[in-house]
Amino acid sequence: MLFRSAVANRAPPGLFGGLIADVPFVDVVNTMLDADLPLTPPEWLEWGNPITDPAVFESMRAYSPYDNVAPRSYPAILALGGLTDPRVTYWEPAKWVARLQSTMTGGGPVVLKTNMQAGHGGASGRFDRLAEVALEYGFALACATRGAALDTTAGTVQGKASS
């Protein structure tokens, strides 16, 4: 998810119709600077420690999606978070979406859905999980058919004239 979110900051406008960011790790710098988070110190072995190494800090800042949001057009983005996620805290996608919404100059929409009963793996229970999948598929379909009309009776997409 980190890679997809970082690409959204760098890709030419219009390259992607949409992006689904499912529990995205987007605030790399702040997370890796917080030694009180349970997964941060063990991750320093792989990522490096930005607290003690300025080069690691600068490297993380260079690719961290949250730190690289710029005034530009972004694709439609659906960010999903879980309130009880121990890996990607719920405020990461929330902060990222807020920054995108206040900074972007076009494109979108950029929306956030926080599941108040879920962790990193999403909803539990068959029907709750199916509802999450339906939301993601519906968003993807809406992005793919933007500018087109979906004929639900025939299951086909018809071109729609631009105005």
Where are these regions (language model features)?
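Active-site-proximal cap/loop segments of hydrolase catalytic domains
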Residues: 1-163
